[in-house]
């Protein structure tokens, strides 16, 4: 999602719109789906955060899922590269001048890899086996144990 840009449905996501949801859910609470289909989870989001430009995501496709393997191949070849958000509107304001709905606060529950995103600029910008290997190692390490003074 890019801030301040109107999508194909007439929505404009405003800076800060994801903040509450990300604070409550974290990256692990937002699902990675294919084409918004809840029956097709394809991986996990490792990092989701707001930047000055919009929503930044870093994810890992699950190689143990057939669709995950297919999507990795399609992403590498450029056959698919769209991203789209699934959310519930918490607060919005109608903008009659540009005939759009400005999304001020949304409850983000999923981000999908899609063929045709509603916002043309919402695209995957980097696909790498190396970053997937790093992601696998980060998951394998687990949390750092807390030190205690006994």
Model-identified regions with their sequence ranges:
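Signature of dsDNA virion morphogenesis modules
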Residues: 1-141
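Short, charged, intrinsically disordered terminal tails
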Residues: 138-150
């Amino acid at each position: 999602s890019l801030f301040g840009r109107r999508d194909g449905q007439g929505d404009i996501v405003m800076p800060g719109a994801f903040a509450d949801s990300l604070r409550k859910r974290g990256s692990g609470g937002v699902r990675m789906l294919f084409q918004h289909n809840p029956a097709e989870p394809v991986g996990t989001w490792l990092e989701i955060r707001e930047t000055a430009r919009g929503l930044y995501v870093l994810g890992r496709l699950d190689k143990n899922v057939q669709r995950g393997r297919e999507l990795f191949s399609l992403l590498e070849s450029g056959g698919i590269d769209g991203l789209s958000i699934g959310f519930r509107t918490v607060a919005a304001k109608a903008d009659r001048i540009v005939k759009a709905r400005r999304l001020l606060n949304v409850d983000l529950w999923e981000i999908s890899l899609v063929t045709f995103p509603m916002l043309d600029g919402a695209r995957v910008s980097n696909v790498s086996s190396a970053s997937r290997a790093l992601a696998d190692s980060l998951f394998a390490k687990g949390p750092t144990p807390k030190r205690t003074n006994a």
